[in-house]
Structure formats: C-alpha cells, structure tokens
Regions:
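Intrinsically disordered low-complexity regions specifically enriched for long asparagine
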Residues: 1-2, 26
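Short, acidic/polar
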Residues: 3-18, 72-74, 96-97
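CE4/NodB-like, metal-dependent polysaccharide N-deacetylase domain
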Residues: 7-28, 54-58, 110
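Beta/alpha (TIM)-barrel catalytic core signal, keyed to glycine-rich beta->alpha loops juxtaposed to Asp/Glu
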Residues: 30-187
Length: 187
C-alpha cells in the first residue's frame, strides 16, 4: 500500500475485519513493494505515514511504526512527520545485527523490534552458540532471544508450539559481556 487513500481504506478495512476498537501496533510493512525490493518509494511512504498519523490520533492504534526501513527511509519519514515512528521492525539476530539502523533508531527514540531472532531456525545448530547456551543452562533459542534483548531491541520470535513459546519467554538471565562479544563476532 503506497498511497494515502489506500492506507486509510485498508486501515478501516482491517478494523472492520478484526472487530476490535483499536490495534496495539500498526506498521508500514516495507519501504517498497515486495516485488520491487530496493525501489525508491520515499514520496509514497510519506503519504502513507500521514494516514498512519491520523490513524494514531483517532485512537484506532496505540502505536505506529515502520518495518524493514533503512536509515535513508527513516530519515525521510522523520523529516516529514508530526509523529515519529515508535517502532522499526527489522530482521535482527546473531550474525545479522544491522548496527547502523539500530543505532539510528535508538538515537531517534524509535524502538527496534527484532523479528527472526532465531534466523528462521538457521542458528539453532550453531556450535558456538550451543556452547554459550550450555554455560547458562539455556537453549540456543533462549540465548538468541536474550541476545537481541541485550542489544537493546525487542525480540519477536515466532512459534506455534506451546513449549517453545514458554522457552522464548524464559529469558530472565544475563549473557556476560565476554559472551556477547563472542556472539557479536559470529557471521
């Protein structure tokens, strides 16, 4: 959705379809259509953001944000908004830190929400992470989720299995600075 009118229409349709009075978080899912990854939609994103601001001001959402936005994309919104994005949801996991974006978001008061903290399962068999996890008596998944949290982002792991969901919540431990440095060095 890359126009003000479509953004308004789809927000209203979403509210009707889910049957709720408000949504906790409403995002622009990407700065470009998925069929045109990397294309420049700056003007269109600014239009959509204006609709997002209105949606927020109406009380139909508690928070508004962006997803998969680069520093350039974020700055375009910041320079043309009355209300700054509250969240930037980005892919974030051990080996994929996106430090420039996370630092920029933090400096501008934007919460980074890290999706795929388990790298869509790819890091679950990583031996180095497994050794660190064993040291804390935790699973690789728990260390991976905790890592994202300690990097200052809100981890957003996906699971439909009750045991994994409970495990993803059970991250009340601290990874040492040395171990964070080891995890930072992984690719």
């Amino acid at each position: 959705i890359k126009s003000y009118e479509k953004a308004v229409r789809h927000a209203e349709l979403t509210m009707k379809n889910i049957g709720l009075d408000y949504i906790d978080l409403y995002l622009i899912h990407a700065p470009w259509p998925w069929t045109e990854i990397g294309a420049d939609y700056t003007r269109e994103n600014i239009e959509v953001w204006k609709a997002m601001e209105e949606f927020y001001e109406s009380g139909k959402t508690r928070s508004i944000g962006i997803s998969n936005f680069s520093v350039k994309d974020i700055d375009a919104i910041l320079e043309n908004s009355r209300i700054n994005p509250m969240v930037n949801q980005i892919k974030l996991h051990i080996g994929h830190r996106q430090q420039e974006i996370t630092s920029h978001c933090t400096a501008n008061g934007i919460l980074v929400e890290g999706y795929s903290p388990l790298a869509t399962g790819k890091i679950l068999s990583n031996g180095e992470i497994a050794r660190i996890a064993e040291k804390y008596g935790k699973s690789v998944a728990q260390v991976s989720v905790r890592y994202v949290l300690q990097k200052g982002a809100l981890p957003l792991p996906k699971s439909v299995h009750p045991d994994y969901i409970r495990q993803n919540i059970d991250i009340n431990f601290e990874i040492s600075e040395d171990d964070i440095s080891r995890l930072d060095s992984l690719k």
